[in-house]
Amino acid sequence: MEFIRNREFNSKTFICHIRKATQGEVTLRNTHPFVREMSAKMHVFAHNGKLGAFDQEQKLTGRFQPVGESDSEFSFCYLLDALAPLWQTGTVPDLDKRMDVISKFAKKIRSYGPANFIYADGDVL
């Protein structure tokens, strides 16, 4: 709390996460929330659950790669790969199109185990 009290933040949304590590070491690189920049927007992701073999069975095909070893960060990179084509114009994509990609992602990870996630794209949570 001291960190927050002593700093000035310019944001309407804050995401925090307390991790019970089930995959990957307890290190800074595996700490939630994960953040990546895409089209001048900060995309943020936190996840609870266990995704089984998701990170072994799925492939990352874009520029987003995990820094750590957690299934959560891998799944975030997978989601960003899927969303990237919508953000290529440099403007915020249509919300319905973004939600369609996110819904398909949620359906896919659901087949690997119980999980929930929080995702913000710099426009909506």
Residue ranges with predicted function:
Residues 1-47, 51-125:
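Conserved short alpha-helical segments that host acidic/polar catalytic motifs at enzyme active sites
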